[in-house]
């Protein structure tokens, strides 16, 4: 009896039925490979399966050449290729665990040359439906590019085995673990052109490798560090809108609606290595390269849009009278390169800026700028950034006039009680030459972190001091506070008394009375209780009156009792009406006769 006639689908199970010889690989037609598994024609089981099954090996597989180029995923554990079939396609029921394993293996091994020979046959049930996910990932028009950039390269290094030898069976977990191990090793050796993984690059010595803080460096990179060494990260390159001068797969930028923190926003030209090549195949900044950035021929100019700069000065030509943008340049390199000016608008190179001046006490070096739209967020160290043009905001404000409210945190504190600010001239003076030793890289990274953190915390503290409410009332003397409180109504005094213990003590000690208070001050009636809530006046009482307008009702001696106005079921419940205390039990001075005369006049 044929095995395929019993079940509408076939499951791949490596144990305990037999070995891998029951499932044959399907090599692509463009790049033929030798059979990975023993040939079933020479085994113990005859080949009586139908021809439409995917486990049937093609007839041309035996004549494939055995010499193959270097593998992509077989960088480690080369002796296990006979055991683990990474290039095998099986007929698996959709939704099964083995289908996910097959997808994982297909994504790791499948290149542009494999998609043409893959076929999906619907033999999984009466509905004859295809695996949509498999059909989508193996579509010839959307085939993923080869990781190494080479076409026709086999995914595994095949070691043909004899048909009579027994092959050790491997479980699904072992196969997945080995595939993940090989994929990790392959990704380290062969970085993809467009990597969506978050990577941050920190500039180091030009021409020298950057030493990380304990993490490994990429084998194909130049002066770059991993995520654990940096402070921020680059987002996925496909989520941001196209940048002028960068293709879609090359631009690094933030996601939509994201706020970045850009440290020392600057722009420099390409570095000239001694051999004429750029490290890591990228251009634009010394010791900094993007994954998939253009080659040495094309220089990627990053557009940096700073909301803070645009808020203060939309253009450099029309500046306010009290704001100046000074360009603090670092020392020029030996080649005599001139740094390209960084502007809020991405425009062609402008005429050379005015020479930098020393800001003195009124200058503040902006190292940390909170931005809303930043197309590139780059961290520059103090080692390889000689051709860096930095901007220093200098505010000229006379000491007799008050500082503008929106620019207070740019001003340097004149008093001794303010926190000290770093002078703007300390950055170029601490830049070492490119011929220094590699031991300064770690110290420069630590110095960069400390410098950036200090500036960020200092600016945040100044912004918080700007935005927080000024508590001037706590500094006023008590007699001034009593005079102020005497002009406040009952609700305002009650709020102040419940808010601050200092205000509560002053109100109760001095007996502050509200402007709308109805307590009778007459010595004959001041001890009378409130006619609504029956509360007596106490010194400093600015509370609100709560009462029930209708009397308390009790149905039965043991039954339910309630207030007749609001149907509340307890006698001690607070009143449903809220107002002011009133202990005036006597009618106004005109008395009843005055009211009667008024009614008679009205007739």
UniProtKB/Swiss-Prot annotation:
Residue numbers of Phosphoserine PTMs: 21, 67
Entry's Gene Ontology molecular function annotations: ubiquitin-like ligase-substrate adaptor activity
Pathway(s): Protein modification; protein ubiquitination
Amino acid composition bias (Pro residues), ranges on this chain: 347-356, 417-426
PTM characteristics: Phosphorylated by ATM in response to DNA damage, promoting ubiquitination and degradation by the SCF(FBXO31) complex.
GO biological process terms, semicolon-separated: SCF-dependent proteasomal ubiquitin-dependent protein catabolic process
Transmembrane segments: none
Region annotated Disordered, chain positions: 18-54, 113-165, 235-301, 332-359, 412-442
InterPro entries: F-box-like_dom_sf (IPR036047), F-box_dom (IPR001810), FBXO34/46 (IPR039594)
Domain F-box stretches: 470-522
GO CC annotation terms, alphabetical: SCF ubiquitin ligase complex
Pfam families named among the record's database cross-references: F-box-like
Self-association and partners: Part of a SCF (SKP1-cullin-F-box) protein ligase complex SCF(FBXO46) composed of CUL1, SKP1, RBX1 and FBXO46.
Function: Substrate-recognition component of the SCF(FBXO46) protein ligase complex, which mediates the ubiquitination and degradation of target proteins. In absence of stress, the SCF(FBXO46) complex catalyzes ubiquitination and degradation of MTOR-phosphorylated FBXO31.
Protein known as: F-box only protein 46
Organism: Mus musculus
């Amino acid at each position: 009896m044929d095995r395929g006639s019993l079940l509408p689908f076939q499951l791949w199970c490596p144990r305990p039925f037999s070995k891998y010889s029951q499932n044959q690989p399907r090599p692509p037609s463009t790049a033929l490979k030798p059979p990975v598994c023993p040939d079933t024609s020479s085994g113990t089981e005859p080949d009586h399966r139908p021809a439409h099954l995917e486990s049937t090996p093609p007839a041309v597989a035996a004549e494939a050449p055995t010499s193959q180029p270097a593998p992509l995923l077989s960088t480690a554990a080369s002796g296990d290729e006979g055991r683990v079939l990474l290039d095998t396609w099986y007929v698996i029921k959709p939704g099964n665990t083995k289908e996910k394993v097959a997808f994982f293996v297909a994504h790791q091994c499948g290149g542009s040359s494999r998609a043409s020979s893959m076929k999906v046959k619907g033999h999984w049930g009466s509905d004859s439906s295809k695996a949509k996910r498999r059909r989508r990932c193996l579509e010839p028009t959307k085939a993923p590019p080869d990781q190494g950039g080479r076409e026709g390269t086999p995914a595994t290094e095949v070691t043909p085995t004899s048909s009579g030898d027994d092959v050790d069976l491997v479980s699904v977990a072992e196969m997945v673990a080995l595939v993940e191990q090989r994929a990790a090793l392959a990704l380290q050796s062969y970085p993809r052109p467009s990597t969506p993984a978050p990577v941050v690059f920190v500039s180091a010595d030009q021409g020298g490798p950057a030493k990380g803080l304990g993490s490994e460096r990429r084998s194909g990179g130049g002066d770059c560090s991993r995520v654990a060494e940096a402070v921020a990260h680059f987002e996925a390159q496909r989520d941001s809108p196209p940048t002028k001068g960068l293709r879609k797969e090359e631009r690094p930028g933030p996601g939509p609606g994201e706020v970045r923190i850009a440290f020392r926003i600057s722009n420099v030209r390409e570095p000239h290595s001694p051999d004429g090549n750029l490290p890591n195949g990228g251009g634009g900044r010394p010791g900094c390269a993007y994954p998939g950035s253009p080659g040495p021929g094309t220089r990627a100019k990053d557009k940096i849009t700073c909301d803070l700069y645009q808020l203060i000065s939309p253009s450099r030509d029309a500046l306010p009278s009290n704001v100046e943008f000074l360009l603090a340049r670092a020392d020029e390199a030996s080649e005599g390169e001139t740094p390209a000016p960084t502007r809020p608008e991405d425009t062609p190179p402008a005429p050379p800026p005015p020479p930098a001046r020393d800001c003195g006490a009124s200058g503040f070096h902006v190292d940390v700028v909170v931005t809303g739209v930043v197309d590139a967020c780059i961290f520059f160290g103090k080692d390889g950034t000689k051709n860096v043009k930095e901007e220093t905001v200098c505010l000229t404000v006379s000491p007799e006039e008050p500082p503008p409210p929106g620019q207070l945190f740019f001003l340097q504190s004149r008093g001794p009680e303010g926190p000290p600010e770093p002078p703007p001239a300390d950055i170029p003076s601490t830049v070492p030459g490119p011929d220094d030793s590699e031991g300064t890289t770690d110290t420069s990274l630590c110095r960069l972190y400390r410098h950036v953190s200090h500036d960020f915390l200092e600016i945040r503290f100044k912004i918080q001091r700007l935005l927080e409410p000024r508590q001037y009332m706590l500094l006023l003397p008590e007699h001034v506070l009593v005079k102020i409180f005497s002009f406040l109504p009952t609700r305002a005094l009650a709020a102040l008394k419940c808010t601050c213990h200092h205000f509560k003590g002053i109100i109760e000690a001095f007996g502050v009375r509200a402007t709308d208070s109805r307590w009778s001050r007459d010595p004959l009636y001041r001890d009378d209780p409130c006619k609504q809530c029956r509360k007596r006046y106490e010194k400093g009482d600015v509370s609100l009156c709560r009462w029930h307008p209708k009397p308390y009702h009790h149905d039965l001696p043991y039954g339910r009792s309630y207030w007749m106005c609001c149907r509340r079921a307890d006698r001690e419940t607070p009143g449903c009406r809220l107002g002011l205390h009133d202990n005036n039990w006597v009618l106004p001075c005109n008395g009843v006769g005055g009211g009667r005369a008024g009614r008679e006049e009205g007739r």
